Every structure is written in structure tokens, then in C-alpha cells.
Regions:
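ATP-binding pocket architecture of kinase catalytic cores
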Residues: 36-138
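Active-site acidic catalytic loop and adjacent metal/ATP-binding pocket
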Residues: 41-51, 55-57, 169-213, 227
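Conserved N-terminal boundary motif of the eukaryotic protein kinase catalytic domain
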Residues: 28-36
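Start-of-helix signal in alpha-solenoid helical-repeat scaffolds, especially tetratricopeptide repeats
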Residues: 71, 251, 255-259
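An alpha-helical support segment within catalytic cores of ATP-dependent transferases
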Residues: 12-29, 134-184, 194, 245, ...
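Active-site activation/catalytic loop segments of kinase-like enzymes and analogous catalytic loops
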Residues: 212-243, 258-275, 290
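A general structural signal marking secondary-structure boundaries and capping sites
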Residues: 25, 126-134, 172, 222, ...
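ATP/Mg2+ or Mg2+-diphosphate-binding catalytic cores
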Residues: 5, 159, 266-295
Length: 295
């Protein structure tokens, strides 16, 4: 936002990004920059190029803060991973924007995602990530659920939902099997096949948590059935740095599954309240039904 002689003028996201780019590279010409939005459920990412530089701009947005998104944390995490070659490199952290390198390559297609050869690549990438030193940002799941509860549409609340929420807030969580740095939003839209290999993008929810929780999130997010889950676990546990006891890991994933389902349900409900977009109600409905939440 800026002020003119006639009053307040609100700048668009693209105008704000353009200003950030021109401050970062003051010798470039503003008119040479081309900016376009990138697809996603939050619509806060932009691609920018002037022919010489190719940049992804990720905005710090107020609704994202309510969901736990923090670009300063994401900046620190990506710098932490800079030697692993599994994530984009940070160009700069400037006010309101995280600027990243644009990675050439193609997003993984849905039909490619569950193929055996791809599962091997994905397992190798995730075991590499899960074997890194901790980020230093542990997942505060109860705090997250409590925060989301304050932001949902109160018109949708029912006594059964209140009882369910109290149960998750007060019940003991599964013990940690292996604490690791994790991505928490692994799906085909966030996986990029590049000339340098498979990479993960969109690290805004990355955290430190149990690998069982992370893999339960992977399975839920991608709607993998039992055979697909077992295929992946064989690949994951077969990696040199994979978790060795596949049976124990599978049990741990099952223990975490209700917690993951509820976390994702709450995310959809908050996004519905924020955006009014009915797609979030549709995405939430199967999870609501699994918990017996009806109107």
C-alpha cells in the first residue's frame, strides 16, 4: 500500500513483486520483467523473468500466517538444504517476499506418480531428506489444531465435532519412532523432474516430526490404497538410508493416520472460511464422513 495526493493506492501482488525485483537488481529495467501467477491452492506464487533471470516469488500473506506459513522459516529451511540438491536455491529474502531460483523441468503427472520406477525415485528423495539434520522447527500439532479451531466457520460446528476436537486436543499422541526433517506436502504438483534429478518445491509446511506422521500425510494426501502404500514402503525401507523395520514403520503410520486426517480436515475447513471457495468443502467432505461428522 502507498499514499498519493488523492488518497491510498493498493498495489497488486505483481506490482509489489516487481518493486522487490527492481530493488534486488537495480540495474534491470522494470518494463523488461514479465510476471505471471503459478497455480496452487493458495495462489501466492509467481514466476518472473526478464530474459536473464528466472525467479519464483513467494509472498508472505496474512491468511498464510493463520495456517502457519512463515517465509522466514521457509527461507531458513531451504538454506539448510542448499547442499542436498533436492530443493530450489534461495536467491534472497526481502520484505514480504521469498525469491527462489526457477527450476527447469516438468511437474510429475498423476499417472506417473504411482509407477514403480517413480516410487523408487520418490523413496530415494524422501530418505535423503529424512536423513538430514533437523531443521530446528518442530511440529506443534496440538497448537496448530487449536489455532485452526479458532478460524473455522462456526456455523458448521456440531456437538459431535466439538467432542471430536476435544479428544484430539487431550489424547496422548503416538510416541516418536524417528524424528526427522520432513516436507509435509508431497504430491505430484510439488514434485519436479529436472535435468539434475527429482526435486521438491513448495516447502512452506516443512517441519521436524516423526517419519510415521510424514508418511501418513503422504498416503492421505495422495489417496493411496493399501497396495500402493506397501509398494512405497518396500522402496522406502529398501533405500540405504531408509528405515529398516518396515512392519514397525507401517504400524506407526496407522497410529498417526487419524491425527493426519484431522489435521488435513482442519486445513480444508480454515481455507473454506478464508476463501469461500466450495472446492475446500468438497475436499473436506470425505474426511468429515470418516469421522462421522454430518449436519
Amino acid at each position: 500500500m502507498r499514499f498519493s495526493g488523492q488518497g491510498t493506492v493498493t498495489l497488486s501482488n505483481q506490482d509489489c513483486l516487481l518493486r522487490a525485483l527492481c530493488r534486488q537488481w537495480p540495474y534491470t529495467t522494470a518494463s523488461n520483467w514479465k510476471i505471471r501467477p503459478l497455480s496452487g491452492l493458495t495462489n501466492e506464487n509467481y514466476y518472473a523473468t526478464n530474459g536473464e533471470y528466472h525467479i519464483v516469488g513467494r509472498r508472505q500473506w496474512q491468511q498464510g500466517k493463520q495456517l502457519g506459513v512463515n517465509r522466514q522459516r521457509e527461507n531458513a529451511i531451504l538454506r539448510h538444504l542448499s547442499q542436498t540438491k533436492i530443493a530450489p536455491q534461495v536467491i534472497a529474502m526481502v520484505p514480504h517476499w521469498l525469491l527462489l531460483e526457477w527450476l527447469p523441468g516438468h511437474i510429475i503427472e498423476q499417472n506417473e506418480f504411482s509407477q514403480p520406477d517413480f516410487l523408487q525415485k520418490l523413496a530415494a528423495l524422501l530418505t535423503t531428506l529424512h536423513h538430514q539434520p533437523l531443521f530446528g522447527y518442530p511440529l506443534q500439532l496440538r497448537h496448530q489444531l487449536a489455532s485452526h479451531w479458532l478460524q473455522i466457520d462456526k456455523a458448521r460446528l456440531t456437538p459431535r465435532w466439538l467432542r471430536l476436537h476435544k479428544r484430539f486436543i487431550s489424547s496422548p499422541m503416538p510416541s516418536i519412532l524417528k524424528l526427522s526433517p520432513v516436507h509435509m506436502d508431497v504430491h505430484c504438483g510439488n514434485l519436479l523432474n529436472t535435468p539434475q534429478g527429482l526435486k521438491l518445491i513448495d516447502w512452506e509446511y516443512a517441519t521436524d516430526t516423526d517419519i510415521g506422521f510424514a508418511l501418513a500425510t503422504l498416503f492421505c494426501t495422495n489417496h493411496w490404497d493399501e497396495p500402493q502404500q506397501q509398494d512405497f514402503l518396500r522402496c522406502y525401507c529398501g533405500q540405504p538410508s531408509g528405515y529398516r523395520d518396515r512392519t514397525l514403520l507401517a504400524r506407526q503410520i496407522k497410529r498417526w493416520q487419524p491425527w493426519v486426517d484431522y489435521m488435513i480436515l482442519m486445513w480444508f475447513e480454515v481455507r473454506w472460511k478464508q476463501s469461500g471457495d466450495p472446492q475446500f468443502l468438497a475436499l473436506a467432505q470425505p474426511l468429515r464422513l470418516s469421522f462421522g461428522l454430518t449436519f
